[in-house]
Amino acid sequence: MALCLWLFLVLPICCWCQGAVDLGDSGVFQPQSALTDMEFASVSTYRGPGNTDPRPNKELPILLWWSSNLFPHFPGDTERVDCAHSSCLVTSNRKVQLYRRTASIIFYGTDFRAYEAPLPRLPHQTWALFHEESPMNNYLLSHSVGIRLFNYTATFRRESDYPLTLQWLPSLDYLLAPTAISLQEKNHWRQAGLAPVLYMQSHCDVPSDRDRFVQELMKYIEIDSYGKCLNNKPLPEYLEDTSTATSEDRRFMSFVARYKFHLALENGLCPDYMTEKLWRPMHQGCVPIYRGSTTVADWLPNNHSAILVEDFSTPRELADFIKALDQDDVEYLRYLKYKTPSEITNLRLLEGLESREWGVNDMSKPNYLNGFECFVCDKENERLAARKAHRKNPKQNQPPQPKMANSSHMGCPLPSPGYGPVENVEPNDSWLQMWPQDYWQSLDQAEGLESLIRHNVSEPSLLWQHIQSIAVRRARGLSNDSR
């Protein structure tokens, strides 16, 4: 048992095949009252073509959704899911945490808190992470010691087990939609006084520090800024309730489509993190000026469909390029060629949209929450079957192989200033005081939680004590035994 706990350091599910799993056999680990109703959970109407699972509910493995704010079923807190190859019971009832049939706990990344983690972590349980949102929501997951706590992942990174990279792109047709406003009309609005560039943002203090970049860019080119951030122009009264730029209200979309260029600046910088800020301008037939994912070029329709901030050495150089493009209709229209199907030449994009098993507003496919849930269900049934076979005949059947996430499943870099080196940022700057500190404090919490798990602690409130102990060891020049 001690060996199993120690190996959580590098193989958090190394004890899949060990006798420690029998911890769940004693009565204290079987809160039967919580399971009484679960045995009679409703049966889903869909069963995958490869699913011939004959087991009744009382024999199925249980998946526990840990977040109190997220359970992708309605109504109730328990459901039977019949997936592509196998079936599970899924629940949000935390009373089953220590039950021996609870095979995996699914966490929603934004809500995951080290000081609320389900401890002790049982050797027979896996942890699954679903995190489709910004890296800024939980930097604990961007550190290697944090992401290694999970066995299955669904994130915006293509390297995750269940990638959500194109979650903000509903379909190929979304890109191919006709240009909302013709170039001739856009030029008319330019002559009427609109700036060439639109900035629509009301979430100001973010890790990417985009406002600092926009402030510098404004020195060299005219930008109409309608949101709360760097506002220099009021929205029409009929659009005031859409000032956060998250709405696809028809009138709002028509208004912003007048602009030839849209500043598309993500709130966090991380490979493969791309949101509606990129895809919406392209849907409308506007040219995005993009800063966010460092790998965005891997997913664009072709090599001439967006202006990438990182391709320019200075904001002034970028401004000069935009000004020239604003005056050249032929060159500008080259950026919209992807509106013709044959001009979408990026096979990775085409294959990514075609092969993803989940859909966006597509009734023929599951949403990505239920899709990931079934992914975990099938993987857990595979693991449990392999463990059973190994126990029955160890010589003939290999034990299930431990699986652990790594930094490529999420890892995002330390936030950096939107413009200029960090040394040029004033010490009392709100961005400097917030986001770099949050990034490193999240590392402290990740190391603290890993220490709690490794020491088989059952009380998450002891997190701060473990963090302090790690800090003291580091200050004394001792190695950190959590790594």
Curated annotation (Swiss-Prot):
The chain crosses the membrane at residues 2-21. Glycans are attached at residues 151, 303, 406, 428, 456, 480. One of its GO terms (cellular component) is Golgi membrane. Residues 387-425 are annotated as: Disordered. Belongs to the glycosyltransferase 10 family. Pfam families: Glyco_tran_10_N, Glyco_transf_10. InterPro entries: Alpha-1_3-FUT_met, Glyco_tran_10_C, Glyco_tran_10_N, Glyco_trans_10, GT10-like_C_sf. This is GDP-fucose protein O-fucosyltransferase 4.
